[in-house]
Amino acid sequence: MRFDLENQAYKSLPRLLERDFGITVKERLIRRFIKNKKGESLEINIIGKGEKDGKEINIIGEAKTNLSLRHIEDFLDRLKDIREVIDGEILPIMVTHMTEPEVEEYALKKGIKVYYSYEF
């Protein structure tokens, strides 16, 4: 399994989140599993904590080489489970090498920020 896209994102997202949202990353961005309310493991590609204006922000992200509408729908479903076990505000992000314009528009309408690998 390759994690190149995620590994690039871990290094560059702190700068991008500061630039775009004024969020300072306070807890290293990592890949890990968390348990949902049913006790099932959920893989989180990008997870960490940030801060904006003294308020804690949970950074939750998914990495997909070629982002599709289906990936966004799956991520939105996963976010529902995550919100049940993580307190506080969540900033959902997706990182990708490429996607179609309408897919990025859909993500933005759903409140998901999309970052491209060329921004890293």
Task: List each language-model region with its residue ranges.
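Active-site metal-binding core of divalent-cation-utilizing nuclease and nuclease-like domains
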Residues: 25-54
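Domain-level recognition of nuclease-like catalytic cores that cleave nucleotide substrates
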Residues: 91-120
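Short, well-ordered secondary-structure micro-motifs
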Residues: 37-39, 72, 104-106
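Charged, alpha-helix-enriched surfaces in structured cytosolic catalytic cores
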Residues: 4, 8, 41, 70, ...
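Conserved catalytic cores of phosphodiester-cleaving nucleases, focusing on short active-site segments
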Residues: 13, 44-50, 54-69, 75-80
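Arginine/glycine-rich "motif VI" loop of SF2 helicases in the C-terminal RecA-like domain
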Residues: 80-88
